[in-house]
Each structure stands twice: as structure tokens, then as C-alpha cells.
Regions:
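Acidic/His- and Gly-rich active-site-bordering loop/insert found
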Residues: 1-123, 145-150
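Short, conserved micro-motifs enriched in small and acidic residues
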Residues: 11, 120-133, 230-237, 512-516
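An extended, acidic, His-containing surface patch that forms the Zn2+-binding/catalytic region
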Residues: 16-17, 32-37, 325-532
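A glycine-centered beta->alpha junction motif in the catalytic cores
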Residues: 71, 218-225, 293-295, 492-507
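Acidic/histidine-rich catalytic neighborhood of metal-dependent amide-processing enzymes
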Residues: 115-209
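Short glycine/serine- and small hydrophobic-enriched flexible loop segments
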Residues: 136-144, 242-249, 523-527
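Short glycine/proline-enriched loop/turn "hinge" motifs that connect secondary-structure elements
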Residues: 146-147, 207-213, 277-283, 392-395, ...
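Midchain, well-structured core segments that form catalytic/ion-binding scaffolds
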Residues: 175-384
Length: 532
């Protein structure tokens, strides 16, 4: 599978799904039961596909395994880019390179890893085709059991590295498919990889939950002025910098959950909208933050962001008014110190657009959104849309518009309340202890999978209130997750391979765990959980 290129957003990604389906059809079970493989449309042109394969046993209870097959681009392989999908040749080339020059510390570790014979390089080898391979191995072994109890289903999806459109489209198609196939999906295992720079003790893990991600933005409209007369306007940059100071790396804004603390919010983009030099202060600036969550809801976070931005706006205007008054006294003139700011949510801005420009203005914005839709940069799409909305609504400053700049990834966690959750937890623990004994190793529980992943949408039904808030305050429709109201909900954990430096030139998987321990461990979970 690694030898089949599948970079996100490319025709190779689109062609991977049908290839994978053909590979699965080589398994004897599927030769006898070809209708137990489905290829379901996801998105794009050419159309990318989700691949679904079920091995049936007795009854309706079903355990789902899930992994993504898209990979990030290969440009960082540089001169070895042509070998990125050829693990054997790449290993030989990397060894030749790493033994020919002075190395950085991470390269010294990579050389030692490769010389040990336990690590295999290649784009997608770690993230995450080795996880998909483990799922296939478990599916095939399950199919070989003559008295199978329950059912085992494998999902292989595209687009995890960009917008999880594969998993989200699968989630929406699954209720009808599960009903047609007569399946009750009662639990799931995401197979994504984790990084471990040590001996694997952290990487050999069962993750009970995954981190959430939000990307709130603040679009600042000031009042421009000639640089020689700064107090005839209001500095948009001052307001933006005060927002930056209030939010950037502020540990008070860290989220907590299950005894763990998320990283603080951090700025991903800060800029104004001018393309050239002027001796005029910019009217509009923009800042966008990556904000990771463990427990706070999107609605609650949005209200907190609004409050923090409002306080920052007040401080900036107060400071500007004080300096305007001080300058006026220095030069013996009257000061303009009556500036007052306001906060608009994206939902409120959209209503202003409708009030000022009517349906025609909304249609012009829709045309712009269609023109921008081919971009893979959510911040570019969002800021251009908000910029147009501000113009259509004739918003004057000082005003700050807030909203969500990209797809919201919910944090999710396996509970312990329902009978199926408890049964799943018991199967996980029994299989964990057996794998530790069988392979003389350790497998630990971890609460939060730190990588943004499909796990946010796997077996998870979004909260209705949160969904409404997100939809109303996300300028670009393509970043609004509109789940099928019949979407299935079930407990999910992440158990996958481990390795080092995924997405990098030296991406590598620890093979003994990925190809020996992991498939056996996963099979043990399935066998115990599906037993009546």
C-alpha cells in the first residue's frame, strides 16, 4: 500500500480506494462474499472513495476498525522524493546519506534506528498505512475462524490530513448501509499512529479520547488615518496586538480534562490586507488562533473568546484615547477621545449584510466563496469572505468580527456509563494484559490522543447546540460539519502503530510492534468483545 501514492487532494488519492478494494477481494472470504465490500463516494473531482469491508459472523453486534489512506506531500524528501513510496530503496538511500556527513541529533537517532533493522521509512509507512495494514490483517484472521461470533468491519477513508471529508461522508452514509447490511455497530477502534522518541513505552497505547481543535479568528476594522495624524483614526493594529497579547500562549486559556492540560492557544496567522506601501494606517487586520480542547464545548469556547476579545478591544481603545488626550495637551489642541468599539459575531455580520445589501449581497458573497473553494488554505478562504462581508455590510470601525476560521474538530472520549462501554473496556483490559504477557511488553492507557484525527468524527454525534453555533459563525460553508441526524454513536478508542517523525523526511515505523504485536492485540480485543 505504501507503494501506491495517495497524497491528499491528488488523483492518486482518488485512485487508492478502488485499488484497496481490489486488494481486499484477494482474501478468500471476499472472493466468496463480494457484496461484503462497498466503495462509497466521498468528495472531489476525480471522486475519492471510502472503502468498507465487513466479515460476518453470527448476530448483528459489530466492531469497527478505521484508518485513513491519504498521506501528506513528499516535497520534504527533497532529492529522495522519487523514493518516498519505495521503502526498501529509500532505506538504502537514507543509510547512504546519513553515513556520509555530519548529522543533527534527530538524524543520529534515525541512523541508529535504521541500522537496528527495526524501523522502516517511507511516506505513509507510519501515518498511517501500517495501521490500515493491521486492520486488514485482523479482518483476514477473523474471516478464517469457522465459528465467528459477531461481525468485524473495516473503514478506510481519504482526506484525514486536510478536512476529514472521508470519515465525515462515511459517518453520514453509515446508518443506511448498516441497516441494509443488518449490522449494529457498537464500538470502534481508530488505528492512527503515534510518535514516541523513546523506547516505545508511550507509543504502545490505548487512547481513550482525542483532542479537539478550534480555529477562532478576530477580524479587526479600525479607522484609517494619515501616519502624520494618527489620532484622526483608530489603529487596527493596536487592537489586533492587544487581542494577540490577551490570547497568544496564555496558559490561563488552557483547557483541562481527565487530568491532562491542553497547550494554550497560539496564533497561526496575523496580517493586514494591504498589498503595497502607503503612509496610511491599515483599516483592517486579522488574527487567527489554534485552540486545542479537552473538555470545553465549542459554544463555551466561543463565548470565552468573545469575552477575551471584548476586553482586549476595550483596553486598546482606552489606551488610544489616553494617548490622544496626552498628545492633544502637548500640542495645545482638542482631543478626539470618544471612540467606542463593538464586537460582531459572524452570525450578526451576516445579518448586517442582509440588511444593508439584501439577497444580492449574499449572492455576491456566495459567488466569491465558490471561486475560493479550490484553495487548500482555510484561513485564506475565511478572511477573504469576511473582508467581502465587511465591505457589503459597510462596517465601520472600531469593530471586531469573530468566528470560526476552519472545520471544528470535537474532542471525544470513551465513557463508562453504558453496558457496551463497560463491555468494551473489559475486552480492552483483558486483551491488553494478554498481549503484555505474550510479548513481554507493556501497553498503557493514555487519555488524550494529541494528533488531530478522524477520531473526532468516528462514532461521534455532534451536540445540536454546538452545531448551531458553529454553523452560524463559520463564514465558509465548506468548513461546517453538517452531520446526518441519524448518525450512529458508539464508544471509540485509538490503538495504532508507533514510530518517529511522521510527516517528515525520516518518517519511520517501529516494525516489530506494527506488524506483530499490534495485529495480535487488535484481534484479541475483537475476539473478546464480540463473544456473546
Amino acid at each position: 500500500m505504501v507503494r501506491w501514492p495517495s497524497e491528499t487532494g491528488t488523483p492518486d488519492e482518488a485512485s487508492f480506494g478502488p485499488k484497496l478494494a481490489e486488494l481486499l477481494r484477494e482474501i478468500p472470504y471476499f472472493q466468496k462474499n463480494p457484496d461484503d465490500i462497498a466503495v462509497v463516494d466521498s468528495h472531489g473531482s476525480p471522486m475519492t472513495k471510502n472503502v468498507i469491508a465487513v466479515v460476518r459472523g453470527s448476530g448483528r453486534r459489530t466492531l469497527a476498525l478505521a484508518g485513513h489512506f491519504d498521506v501528506v506531500e513528499t516535497a520534504n524528501y527533497r532529492d529522495l522524493k522519487h523514493l518516498a513510496f519505495e521503502p526498501d530503496a529509500l532505506l538504502e538511500a537514507l543509510l547512504a546519506d546519513l553515513t556520509s556527513r555530519t548529522l543533527a541529533p534527530n538524524e543520529e537517532k534515525a541512523l541508529s534506528d535504521f541500522q537496528s533493522g527495526n524501523y522502516i521509512p517511507g511516506r505513509g509507512m507510519l501515518d498511517m498505512k501500517s495501521g490500515v495494514a493491521a486492520g486488514i490483517a485482523v479482518l483476514e484472521r477473523f474471516s478464517q475462524q469457522p465459528d465467528r461470533e459477531g461481525n468485524l468491519i473495516l473503514f478506510a477513508t481519504p482526506d484525514e490530513e486536510r478536512g476529514s471529508r472521508g470519515m465525515r461522508s462515511l459517518r453520514d452514509a453509515l446508518p443506511e448501509l448498516a441497516e441494509r447490511w443488518g449490522l449494529d455497530i457498537v464500538a470502534g477502534i481508530n488505528l492512527d499512529a503515534t510518535s514516541d522518541q523513546g523506547d516505545g513505552a508511550e507509543g504502545r497505547a490505548i487512547y481513550r479520547g482525542t483532542i479537539g481543535k478550534q480555529l477562532p479568528f478576530a477580524f479587526v476594522v479600525g479607522q484609517p488615518s494619515h501616519a502624520s495624524y494618527p489620532f484622526e483614526g483608530v489603529s487596527a493594529h493596536l487592537i489586533a496586538s492587544e487581542i494577540m497579547r490577551a490570547v497568544e500562549a496564555n496558559a490561563v486559556l488552557c483547557d483541562t480534562g481527565d487530568g491532562e492540560v491542553s497547550p494554550p492557544p497560539i496564533c497561526l496567522e496575523a496580517r493586514d490586507f494591504r498589498g503595497g506601501y502607503e503612509v496610511t494606517t491599515p483599516e483592517r487586520t486579522w488574527v487567527a488562533f489554534n485552540w486545542l480542547t479537552h473538555s470545553v464545548s465549542p459554544d463555551a469556547l466561543f463565548q470565552r473568546f468573545k469575552a477575551v476579545v471584548g476586553e482586549a478591544l476595550d483596553r486598546a481603545i482606552t489606551h488610544f484615547n489616553v494617548e490622544a488626550d496626552r498628545f492633544a495637551k502637548l500640542v495645545g489642541s482638542e482631543a478626539n477621545v470618544n471612540h467606542k468599539g463593538r464586537i460582531l459575531t459572524t452570525a450578526e455580520l451576516r445579518e448586517e449584510v442582509r440588511r444593508v445589501g439584501g439577497d444580492a449581497a449574499l449572492e455576491r458573497i456566495a459567488v466569491l466563496e465558490a471561486e475560493l473553494s479550490s484553495s487548500d488554505n482555510p484561513l485564506l478562504i475565511t478572511r477573504e469572505l469576511v473582508d467581502r462581508m465587511v465591505a457589503e455590510a459597510r462596517v465601520t470601525g472600531p469593530t471586531v468580527i469573530i468566528g470560526f476560521g476552519s472545520l471544528v474538530y470535537p474532542h471525544v472520549r470513551m465513557g463508562a456509563e453504558t453496558a457496551e462501554e463497560q463491555r468494551f473496556a473489559e475486552a480492552l483490559e483483558t486483551a491488553r494484559l494478554e498481549a503484555e504477557r505474550q510479548f513481554d511488553t507493556t501497553i498503557r492507557y493514555r487519555e488524550i490522543f494529541a494528533g488531530i484525527s478522524d477520531m473526532s468524527f468516528f462514532g461521534h454525534m455532534p451536540d445540536a447546540v454546538d452545531s448551531e453555533v458553529i454553523a452560524a459563525n463559520t463564514p465558509a460553508a465548506q468548513f461546517i460539519d453538517r452531520a446526518n441526524p441519524k448518525a450512529l454513536s458508539y464508544p471509540v478508542v485509538n490503538i495504532g502503530p508507533w514510530g518517529r517523525e511522521y510527516h517528515q523526511r525520516l518518517e519511520r515505523v517501529y516494525a516489530p510492534y506494527a506488524f506483530t504485536v499490534l495485529p495480535q492485540f487488535l484481534y484479541g480485543i475483537a475476539a473478546r468483545f464480540l463473544k456473546p
